[in-house]
UniProtKB/Swiss-Prot annotation:
Gene3D superfamilies: Enoyl acyl carrier protein reductase, NAD(P)-binding Rossmann-like Domain. Substrate binds at A97. Keywords: Fatty acid biosynthesis, Fatty acid metabolism, Lipid biosynthesis, Lipid metabolism, NAD, NADP, Nucleotide-binding, Oxidoreductase. One of its GO terms (biological process) is fatty acid elongation. The lineage of its organism: Bacteria, Bacillati, Bacillota, Bacilli, Bacillales. Belongs to the short-chain dehydrogenases/reductases (SDR) family. FabI subfamily. This is Enoyl-[acyl-carrier-protein] reductase [NADPH] FabI. InterPro entries: Enoyl-ACP_Rdtase_NADH, NAD(P)-bd_dom_sf, SDR_fam. It comes from the Bacteria. It comes from Staphylococcus aureus (strain MRSA252).
Length: 256
């Protein structure tokens, strides 16, 4: 069994118990890793504190970081470094788009809505990687959550699909840029999961049903399955893997 004792990871993007990032946290926790969590708003901190009761973490390392603020990202990671020292990796599961930009026609996306989705869902990985690098002097791993809508046009995914496409390109360029520092950057393309974010996608139940009917495994995946792949990518088991996008979607990406 993989042992991640003496490893420290920052997890970004837990909103509630259904969050993909919480599935990642549960797996890393079971493997013995020390976990550091970031959140955006105070209500998210309260939710995190409740969820921590389900984990085996001896201390609660919680930091408020709004990724739309350079200052908060810079200061947040600086404080993490002061409190816990160097880290071994980051799991980035942050994305946002306005509801109207997900439900309407893509061609009607506003400039403001387009840029907002890009800023939170893609650029945030760039600045997070820049600051996290300072805490990984001997190398490490950064993993981001994406979705098939970044590779293909998926009905009702709209502006978020474009943001995920940007995120996936971001992963590749960060992998190239940070490779000499022995920092690997990868993505996990997770199948549709009932998360808080998924509520904004129109026809989500239809998407879930299509996976059950057409995917090779004939079922949908869950947060913990994504967490298992994240553990692989964040650990030394994947030491030769970077710039990759691994699909955890019951094989749906492989069929027509």
């Amino acid at each position: 069994m993989l042992n991640l004792e003496n490893k420290t990871y920052v997890i970004m993007g837990i909103a509630n118990k259904r969050s993909i990032a919480f599935g990642v946290a549960k797996v890393l926790d079971q493997l013995g890793a020390k976990l550091v969590f970031t959140y955006r708003k105070e209500r998210s901190r309260k939710e995190l504190e409740k969820l921590l009761e389900q984990l085996n973490q001896p201390e609660a390392h919680l930091y408020q970081i709004d990724v739309q603020s350079d200052e908060e990202v810079i200061n947040g990671f600086e404080q993490i470094g002061k409190d816990v020292g160097n880290i071994d990796g980051v799991y980035h599961s942050i994305a946002f788009a306005n509801m109207e930009d997900l439900r309407g026609r893509f061609s009607e996306t506003s400039r403001e809505g387009f840029l907002l989705a890009q800023d939170i869902s893609s650029y945030s990985l760039t600045i997070v990687a820049h600051e996290a690098k300072k805490l990984m002097p001997e190398g490490g791993s950064i993993v981001a959550t994406t979705y098939l809508g970044g590779e293909f046009a998926v009905q009702n995914y709209n502006v978020m699909g474009v943001a995920k496409a940007s995120l996936e390109a971001n992963v590749k360029y960060l992998a190239l840029d940070l490779g000499p520092d022995n920092i690997r950057v990868n993505a996990i393309s997770a199948g549709p999961i009932r998360t808080l974010s998924a509520k904004g996608v129109g026809g989500f139940n239809t998407i879930l049903k299509e996976i059950e009917e057409r995917a090779p495994l004939k079922r949908n995946v869950d947060q913990v399955e994504v967490g298992k792949t994240a553990a692989y990518l964040l650990s030394d088991l994947s030491s030769g893997v970077t710039g990759e996008n691994i699909h955890v979607d019951s094989g749906f990406h492989a069929i027509k």
